[in-house]
């Protein structure tokens, strides 16, 4: 499995619906970019200026919302992941 470093988080991208509520099938270029996913790995965090370690807010298994233009796409073992900085995560879905 991929292990992020620093304040990076690996998110398994949640697939976007390919069909509208009305039954219209969307072309791949018409679909919205995903903005929700599941955290599958969390880095060790960053260090403050005084040397203390800053805790990560998200944990493995959290469902998160993120900005659609952030992160780097990575394909690993036939799955699509996004590598994000923790600051790019907007919210944890409870």
Curated annotation (Swiss-Prot):
One of its GO terms (molecular function) is protein-folding chaperone binding. It is found in: Cytoplasm. GO terms for biological process: chaperone cofactor-dependent protein refolding. GO terms for cellular component: cytoplasm. It comes from the Bacteria. InterPro entries: Chaperonin_GroES, Chaperonin_GroES_sf, Chaprnonin_Cpn10_CS, GroES-like_sf. Pfam families: Cpn10. Keywords: Chaperone, Cytoplasm. Together with the chaperonin GroEL, plays an essential role in assisting protein folding. The GroEL-GroES system forms a nano-cage that allows encapsulation of the non-native substrate proteins and provides a physical environment optimized to promote and accelerate protein folding. GroES binds to the apical surface of the GroEL ring, thereby capping the opening of the GroEL channel. Belongs to the GroES chaperonin family. PANTHER family: 10 KDA HEAT SHOCK PROTEIN, CO-CHAPERONIN GROES. Heptamer of 7 subunits arranged in a ring. Interacts with the chaperonin GroEL. This is Co-chaperonin GroES.
